[in-house]
Each structure stands twice: as C-alpha cells, then as structure tokens.
C-alpha cells in the first residue's frame, strides 16, 4: 500500500503530539505550534529555527527537534551545493539543518519552508485534538 506524503506528515504529527502529551507540555506545545507558522511567514524558516533554539523551555526544544528531524526525513540526501547534501533524519539537528539551509539554492530553501508549513498544519490540528483528550469531561 502506498502512503502519501500528507499521510506520512499526519502520522508523524500525531506521534509528536502524543510525545508532547507524555511529557506533560501539550498545552504549551499546542500554543507554540500555532504561533510558529506565523513566525515562519513573517521572519523566515531559518530565523524561526534560531528562535526555537534560543529558548530554554522544553516545548521549544521539542518542536525544534520535531521540525529538524522531519526535514531530515523528507529532504535528507538532497544536494545542497557541490559535495554537500541535506542531513538525513538520524543526524538532522539545528546546526546541520541550518548550515544546509543557508548553503542551499533558493528552490530547496522554499521547499524546506513549504514542507515545514505543511507539517505544522498537521501538528497544530493533532496537538489541539490531543489536548482535548487531557481535559476533564
């Protein structure tokens, strides 16, 4: 059975919402995932990743890891420039992803931004849905 990229995004987002709930930061993670999309649109992907890296709160670090690992999963191995490739998921961290982004051609940077926004749409929805499971009936 072939699974679409959007289905893979949905599965990944649900797993990450579950992780945030297990670490008891689902409320903060939900709010952050909603604001990060706007931040990307206003400031750009690299600036937003740097913002998440600069914060000490667990939910900021968690979302940063989720986004960089996803970019590694979907873009890993893509040529960035001569002899350099986008890092694969197991090693994709803030520093490696940032280096790949600032060395990448504009079409790859736009693709990374679009992919991040598409994932965030799922994360926002699933984090919000997962949050309601935590609320008393």
Where does each model-flagged region fall?
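Small/polar/charged residue-enriched interaction surfaces, especially the RNA/DNA-contacting tracks
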Residues: 1-137
């Amino acid at each position: 059975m072939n699974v679409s990229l959007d289905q893979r995004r949905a599965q990944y987002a649900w797993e990450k919402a579950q992780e945030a709930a297990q670490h008891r930061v689902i409320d903060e993670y939900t709010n952050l995932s909603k604001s990060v999309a706007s931040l990307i649109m206003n400031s750009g992907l690299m600036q937003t990743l740097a913002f998440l890296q600069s914060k000490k709160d667990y939910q900021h670090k968690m979302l940063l890891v989720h986004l960089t690992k996803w970019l590694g999963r979907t873009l890993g191995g893509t040529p960035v420039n001569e002899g350099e490739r986008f890092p694969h998921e197991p090693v994709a961290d803030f520093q490696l992803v940032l280096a790949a982004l600032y060395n990448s051609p504009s079409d790859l940077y736009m693709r990374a931004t679009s992919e991040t926004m598409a994932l965030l749409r799922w994360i926002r929805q699933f984090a919000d849905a997962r949050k309601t499971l935590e609320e008393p009936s």
